[in-house]
Amino acid sequence: TAEANSKNLKLFYRSKFKVVDLDKFNIGKYDLIVSNPPYIPSRDIKNLSKDIINYEPLTALDGGVDGLDLIKKVIYKSNHLLKRMGMLALEVGHNQYRRALSILRYNGYRAISKECDYNRNVRCIISTKVSFFKFKK
């Protein structure tokens, strides 16, 4: 877990970890938000392996029609939670990098790095909030 990793890295004393429902997350001023929202398009759920479907609840998988519903929500909500120059680390699904990056930019973020999986697909975007913008639906 993130807490265990922070203890191993001797960062626990200066870190706070919260696992919350995005809708109940209060406005605050955070330095970093890490999110792994559901990002699988609804139409693709039926094609997932049984190992995934039997292990994960549907709410942890289904990202809506294009898989971006909760990604958009995290970006919008984090815009009100992060300090200026705060960082957002956001996991994205296969082939969602460009669309997620566009939404981030529109909402006042600048991407500073991307992390790829073993197949060289971008799976995580790390960005910095540089200004406040309205949410693009």
Where do the language-model regions lie?
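Mobile active-site "lid"/loop adjacent to the S-adenosyl-L-methionine
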Residues: Y39-D69
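Helix-to-beta-strand junctions that scaffold the AdoMet/dcAdoMet cofactor pocket
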Residues: L11, E56, L81-R84
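Residue-level signal for inorganic ion chemistry
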Residues: A2, N36, I52, V74, ...
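Conserved SAM/SAH cofactor-binding pocket of Class I
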Residues: T1-N47
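Alpha/beta-hydrolase-fold catalytic nucleophile elbow
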Residues: N36, Y55, E91
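Flexible, glycine-/basic-rich loop-and-beta segments that form/coincide
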Residues: T128-K137
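Conserved Class I SAM-dependent methyltransferase catalytic core
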Residues: V65-K129
